[in-house]
């Protein structure tokens, strides 16, 4: 879908593009609701959204623009807190590598543009090549906390943050 109408409880497709990472954003909202209210319906909704991401093939990355990092965060957090077995690396790679089926090229820069170092910025890695500060800040806000749930990512996330600060 392109969007979800919460009032009508139906997905919406604008016949131009799809944003499959909306499942990640919705999963995050539902998980936080479960933590706050304790109602299992929120956890069940989280699991449905995460199942969509988990069952999607690696080659069909879901990162459209801003929500997938929240799904990657949840994969790491739920694996730590609930003992789930979500494919953390697959979801994290979707946030970085730029190989996404619905917005190919969207990921994290690993290069210089002429004399400018753009390593770590989030945006379009292929074709036009452009990056956005707010997308970068949002991705950092979603992914830095994963080191709390899986310290094995601390070095990698730290290196990415160092590049952002450069």
Residue ranges and their predicted role:
Residues 47, 132-134:
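Amphipathic, non-transmembrane alpha-helical scaffold segments
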Residues 22, 64-65:
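Extracytoplasmic catalytic/substrate-binding loops of multi-pass membrane glycan-assembly enzymes
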Residues 1-17, 67-85, 108-132:
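Carbohydrate-binding/catalytic loop surfaces
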Residues 15, 19, 61-62:
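Alpha-helix N-cap/helix-initiation motif
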């Amino acid at each position: 879908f392109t969007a979800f109408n919460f009032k009508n409880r139906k997905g919406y497709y604008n016949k131009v593009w799809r944003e499959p990472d909306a499942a990640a954003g919705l999963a995050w909202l539902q998980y936080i609701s479960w933590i706050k209210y304790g109602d299992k319906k929120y956890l069940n909704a989280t699991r449905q959204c995460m199942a969509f991401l988990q069952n999607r093939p690696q080659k069909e990355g879901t990162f459209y623009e801003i929500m997938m990092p929240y799904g990657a965060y949840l994969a790491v957090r739920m694996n730590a807190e609930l003992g789930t077995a979500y494919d953390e690396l697959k979801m994290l790679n979707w946030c970085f590598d730029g190989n996404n089926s619905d917005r190919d090229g969207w990921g994290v820069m690993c290069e210089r543009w002429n004399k400018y170092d753009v390593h770590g910025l989030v945006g379009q890695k292929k074709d036009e090549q452009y990056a956005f500060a707010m997308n970068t800040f949002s991705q950092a806000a979603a992914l830095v906390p994963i080191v709390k749930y899986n310290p094995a990512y601390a070095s990698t996330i730290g290196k990415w943050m160092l590049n952002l600060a450069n």
